[in-house]
Every structure is written in C-alpha cells, then in structure tokens.
UniProtKB/Swiss-Prot annotation:
Disulfide bonds: 204-264
Record's keyword annotation contains Secreted: yes
Function of the molecule: One of the major non-collagenous components of the tectorial membrane. The tectorial membrane is an extracellular matrix of the inner ear that covers the neuroepithelium of the cochlea and contacts the stereocilia bundles of specialized sensory hair cells. Sound induces movement of these hair cells relative to the tectorial membrane, deflects the stereocilia and leads to fluctuations in hair-cell membrane potential, transducing sound into electrical signals.
Protein known as: Beta-tectorin
Amino acid sequence: MVVRAFVLLALFAEASAKSCTPNKADVILVFCYPKTIITKIPECPYGWEVHQLALGGLCYNGVHEGGYYQFVIPDLSPKNKSYCGTQSEYKPPIYHFYSHIVSNDSTVIVKNQPVNYSFSCTYHSTYLVNQAAFDQRVATVHVKNGSMGTFESQLSLNFYTNAKFSTKKEAPFVLETSEIGSDLFAGVEAKGLSVRFKVVLNSCWATPSADFMYPLQWQLINKGCPTDETVLVHENGKDHRATFQFNAFRFQNIPKLSKVWLHCETFICDSEKLSCPVNCDKRKRMLRDQTGGVLVVELSLRSRAFSGLCDFSDVLLHLILMLGTWAVL
C-alpha cells in the first residue's frame, strides 16, 4: 500500500510540474563577432527546455537571456576552434565556422517535435596562428533552421572601388592622411533569396572599436536615410543589394586606435506584401516600426522531410545582422 502511494505521488508531482509553453516559430538570431559567436532562439522552442538543448550536440550550456535561450562559442582561436563540436573550414582567405543546436532528450519517450538549428559564420580573414587572431572583418552570416525544413540566407557587407559597385575592395585597407574626406563605397548584398525579397538598410554607423555598441559612434544612416549631406544612399529596398557612400574619416583623440569599424543593421523586405524602397523625403511607416538589426524572411519551401510543399506563411526567420568591417585610417 505504501509503494502504491509513493507511485501515485510521483505521478502527481510529474503532472503538476510546470512546463514551458511551446513556441512554434522557427526563429534563430546569430551574432558573428570577430572572436565569438552568439546564437539565440526564443525560449521553449516546440516545448523544449534550455537544459534539453545542446550546442553542437555536446554541450548543454544554454542560458536564459531575456526571453531567449542563448548559446555562446566564446573562442574562435586555433587552440580552441572545435569548442563544443564547432566545425571549421579554411580556404584562404576565407574561414567558415559551423555549429548547431539540437534537442537531445534521453528519456524513454519524446513528446516534443525534434529541433535542429544549424548556423555558421564566415570570416574574410588572415588567420594568424602565432597570434591566434583574425584580421577582424565579419563578412557573411549563414543560417539554416532545421526544425521544419531548411533555408539558407547569406548576407555580406562589402566595400567597393567606385560608385558602380561592380568591383569589391578587400578590407581592411589603409587610407593615407591625404585621403581623409575621399569617398568610400559600401553595400550589403543578399544571396540565396528569391527576387521578391529586397535588402533594406535600417541604420549604419562607425565606431573606433569592433564592438558595435561602443559608446563613441558616428551615425551614417538612420531609419534608412542619410544623417547628413556627406552620406549618399544609392539604393535601399530596391534590389538584393543596398548601397551607399560616405566620406572617409578618422576618430580624433583616441590613443592607439586608428581603425574605423563600419556596422549596418539590415532586414529583408517582402516586396509582394510591403513597399520596400525607402523614400527619405517621406519615410515609410514600415521603417519606423521595424526593430533594427532584424532580418525578417517569410518563405515557402519544399522540405525533404515532407512529401508536399510546406507553407511557412506564419514562420519568420529572424537573423540579427551585425556586419562589421574596418579600415585603417
């Protein structure tokens, strides 16, 4: 009789345990920093708790962070490039880092749909083994969401040689003092998207540090429009690439710092549902309502896991795009 009571008590305790409310949106946020990769997914994806999700299928190191489960790859240096199963590939001068977050429940039965979010960051780099450091330019973000299907988006922030935006200029590059004030040409380009999706620059700014939140900033583009007459936006929201130019400059009175980092917050606009081109004389309400740095992609695709066409009209793929590149001035 005592044994039965114990079993009933255990069952009651299990049933009364509070579980999280399943979040069925395929969402992943990826921050590609020079030496660190941070990935976030909304809490409770398809009912999974943070302790049931593993980075690289190995490390249960996720933490709760403001409504998200956050996973960090803290060190991309050569001595630790396989952190928690992180895979890397080096094809000079490009370095790719790959990882994934998967559900891994060791219980007898699994009641939640498995999830598998894979992602990678691509760096244009000179990988200095002796210094364990990158030539610090974050160039491209690749993300795949794998819980209901697969999708890959690639975006890159590039410099160009002139206003035709046809020839890329490799960063970092050095400007002589006499070139301060000359025109620099930059753009964000998307690959792997259908023609209906357009690239929209929400904001671009420069810092003397790789940290995009560095307190000293010089704003170039705000809500899709130039902040002053020295900045010219060529295309924004019209094509798979958004382009602009600005005058070269350097930050004053900063000891031992001669690098200027350019950061852009970008999102993808569905031209079949929204008016994407940015009109700077009469700014669209859409731009005011967007949260900066978030790429929003609505998609329909065929998944190998299903026989028919899967409609993801209610699935948003969110990517935080903090592309940074620097010039030595």
